[in-house]
A protein has these predicted regions:
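Generic hydrophobic, aliphatic-rich segments that mediate packing or membrane embedding
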Residues: 73-76, 107, 125, 146, ...
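Generic hydrophobic/packing signal
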Residues: 14, 115, 133-137, 154, ...
């Protein structure tokens, strides 16, 4: 009985040590956790020049789901970055204004955790979310709405005007940049902390045995060389390095 109890204690201690070792292995491999603590998360995603507030987030959410910011009045941000479909569109190539397929055969990247991206769009041409939000709204194959049209429509809706005043003050100028920046503020809140992040933060019980084995293999096989950082976002990598890209229609 004493031997069995001692063995159980030994195995438990060994298991805890292995988990702690795996946490260290993961973090030293470059994997980073999304903070589950709201204060730590806000410190990471907030902008002192345009602080996140409840009013801005709620207003940005309405704009995100509003098709009136597209030329046709049919397409919203959520049309392509569907929050119920992983923040993406789930099709081989995005479909935009006039049922136009993306000319570069690209689908929509997820909006979830995009606040952690060092650059936006597949090619990284945009430095941050507020800048990125301006692109699809105006792009011909996407929402096809000139900035002036978006401004006219939003300013013609009294409820929106009042909400902008509530979010930014009574003297706010509701222009295109302010509209898209407000959408970006909502997008900043679309983060998905998980049990994987809890594990990286030091909770060795957050993952089960099979998940830990998978993480260990993920690191040992070199997957973490590219898929690293926070939310496994990785870094910008050269395209077609191994082989020529072939479109699968």
């Amino acid at each position: 009985m004493k031997l069995s109890k001692s063995l159980a204690i030994f195995l438990l201690g060994a298991s805890t040590m292995l988990a702690s070792t795996l946490i260290e292995k993961a973090t030293t491999s470059g994997l980073k956790a999304i903070p589950s603590d709201e204060a730590k998360l806000m410190k990471m995603i907030d902008d002192k020049n345009d602080p996140i507030t409840k009013e801005k987030v709620e207003l940005g959410k309405k704009l995100y789901f509003d098709p009136r910011i597209s030329k046709s009045g049919l397409i919203s941000c959520n049309t392509c970055h569907n929050l119920g479909l992983g923040g993406a569109d789930g099709v081989p190539a995005a479909i935009g204004h006039g049922w136009t397929m993306n000319p570069h055969h690209l689908n929509s990247p997820t909006v979830y955790n995009s606040v952690f991206f060092k650059a936006q769009f597949w090619d990284g041409r945009s430095p941050h979310l507020a800048d990125q939000a301006q692109g699809p709204v105006q792009a011909g194959p996407e929402m096809a709405a000139p900035a002036s049209l978006v401004e006219q429509r939003i300013n013609s809706i009294p409820e929106y005007v009042e909400e902008f005043k509530g979010a930014y003050g009574k003297d706010v100028k509701v222009d295109f940049a302010k509209i898209t920046a407000t959408i970006a503020t909502f997008e900043k809140t679309l983060v998905t902390p998980s049990k994987f992040d809890k594990f990286l933060s030091g909770n060795d019980k957050a993952l089960n045995k099979e998940e830990k084995e998978g993480l260990n293999t993920f690191i040992d096989k070199g997957c973490a060389s590219c898929h690293t950082g926070i939310a496994l976002g990785g870094t910008m990598q050269p395209f077609e390095l191994a082989a020529k890209y072939k479109l699968q229609a």
